[in-house]
């Protein structure tokens, strides 16, 4: 099997390089690649890459993911998140390739308390990022490439690079008091979990093309940013890390205004994914604790 990966150096892309390698011949690209174009600001270039390589599977982990910055550069966000995805979808259809693509809970309005159902619940993005990702689903893949799998996910983290836990730990060493948002609900999902589930889904799809479609892929359970931070601090103290923090306050979203609106409810219903791919998605704490353990034992916090 020949697999083409876009966005190899991002949080998810890095884990995908590991998870996809056993499936066959992997060609992994990013914006700086020179042998083939992996630059999503060049739709014609990435489409030409697909036509030259003629892969069996394309995995797209490239995106404009700066949610707040997207508000001030909507055209650029649309170019990276939708226009180039459409170009890839058309080229993939020409060569008969599967396309695996990642989307977001931000396609929903973020209201209520019930996990969003894929395919039945109405979409209504709150921000530019959500609009561009919804466009990548509907106007690109669903329109131009039948052999696609779209994974909507949320609250993605990885041990590589910056993440929420590292930021909280840094602040907790510097300050005695912190205030963290407690009215946004979601499921922290590790890039490692996304990559492993993607590799499994590809193996299933190759043998059962009827699994093509839209899925929600997040870890189990539910938390808030405040409770997520509380877990991070609890695990840090268990590991013997000294924190200056002695008070953690819960505050509403309005306490931290941002250019892009954030949803109150980022919960996603994953029943369809678990049924079609015969997998169980572990509770969010499992992955976060694993990431923290690796962080505590391999680096100085």
From Swiss-Prot:
Q: How is the cofactor bound?
A: Binds 1 Mg(2+) ion per monomer.
Top-level enzyme category: oxidoreductase
Q: Which residues take part in binding dTDP-beta-L-rhamnose?
A: 104-105, 155
- The highest taxon in the source lineage is Bacteria
Q: Which residues form a coiled coil?
A: none
One of this protein's GO BP terms? lipopolysaccharide biosynthetic process
Query: Which catalysed reactions does the entry list for this protein?
Result: dTDP-beta-L-rhamnose + NADP(+) = dTDP-4-dehydro-beta-L-rhamnose + NADPH + H(+)
| UniProt cross-references to CDD domains, sorted A to Z | dTDP_HR_like_SDR_e (cd05254)
Active-site residues, record numbering mapped to chain: 129 (proton donor/acceptor)
Keywords of this protein's UniProt record, alphabetized?
Carbohydrate metabolism, Lipopolysaccharide biosynthesis, Magnesium, Metal-binding, NAD, NADP, Oxidoreductase
Annotated positions binding NADH = 10-12, 30, 39-40, 63-65, 129, 133
Annotated metabolic or biological route of this protein: Carbohydrate biosynthesis; dTDP-L-rhamnose biosynthesis; Bacterial outer membrane biogenesis; LPS O-antigen biosynthesis
Give the residues the record marks as binding NADPH. 11-12, 39-40, 63-65, 102, 129, 133
Q: Which InterPro entries match?
A: dTDP_dehydrorham_reduct (IPR005913), NAD(P)-bd_dom_sf (IPR036291), RmlD-like-bd (IPR029903)
Would you name any one GO CC term? cytosol
Q: Does the entry feature the keyword NADP, yes or no? A: yes
Name the EC number(s): 1.1.1.133
Cite a single GO MF annotation.
Answer: metal ion binding
Self-association state and partner proteins as the record states:
Homodimer.
**Its job:** Involved in the biosynthesis of the dTDP-L-rhamnose which is an important component of lipopolysaccharide (LPS). Catalyzes the reduction of dTDP-6-deoxy-L-lyxo-4-hexulose to yield dTDP-L-rhamnose. RmlD uses NADH and NADPH nearly equally well.
Q: Which PANTHER family match?
A: DTDP-4-DEHYDRORHAMNOSE REDUCTASE, METHIONINE ADENOSYLTRANSFERASE 2 SUBUNIT BETA
Can you tell me which family this protein belongs to?
Answer: Belongs to the dTDP-4-dehydrorhamnose reductase family.
Spell out the protein name for this chain.
dTDP-4-dehydrorhamnose reductase
Q: Please name the source species.
A: Escherichia coli
């Amino acid at each position: 099997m020949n697999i083409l990966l876009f966005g190899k150096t991002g949080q998810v892309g890095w884990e995908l390089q590991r998870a996809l390698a056993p499936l066959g011949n992997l060609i992994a690209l990013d914006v700086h690649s020179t042998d083939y174009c992996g630059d999503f600001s060049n739709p014609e270039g990435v489409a030409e890459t697909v036509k030259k390589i003629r892969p069996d599977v394309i995995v797209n982990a490239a995106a404009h993911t700066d949610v707040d910055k997207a508000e001030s550069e909507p055209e650029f966000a649309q170019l990276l998140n939708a226009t180039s995805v459409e170009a890839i979808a058309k080229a993939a259809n020409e060569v008969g390739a599967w396309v695996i693509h990642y989307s977001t809970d931000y396609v929903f309005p973020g209201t209520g308390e019930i996990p969003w159902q894929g395919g039945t619940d109405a979409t209504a993005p709150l921000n530019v990022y959500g609009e561009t990702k919804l466009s990548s689903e509907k106007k690109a893949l669903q329109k131009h490439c039948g052999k696609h799998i779209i994974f909507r996910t949320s609250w993605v983290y990885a041990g590589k690079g910056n993440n929420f836990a590292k930021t909280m730990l840094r602040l907790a060493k510097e300050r005695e008091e912190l205030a963290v948002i407690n009215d946004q609900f979601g499921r922290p999902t590790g890039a490692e979990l996304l990559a492993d589930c993607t590799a499994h889904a590809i193996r299933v799809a190759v043998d059962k093309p009827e699994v093509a479609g839209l899925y929600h892929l997040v870890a189990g359970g539910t938390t808030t940013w405040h409770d997520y931070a509380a877990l991070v601090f609890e695990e840090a103290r268990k590991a013997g890390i000294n924190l200056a923090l002695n008070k953690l306050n819960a505050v509403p979203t309005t306490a931290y205004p941002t250019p892009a609106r954030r949803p109150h409810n980022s919960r996603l219903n994953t029943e369809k994914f678990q049924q079609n791919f015969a997998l169980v998605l572990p509770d969010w704490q499992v992955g976060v604790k694993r990431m923290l353990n690796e962080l505590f034992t391999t680096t100085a916090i």
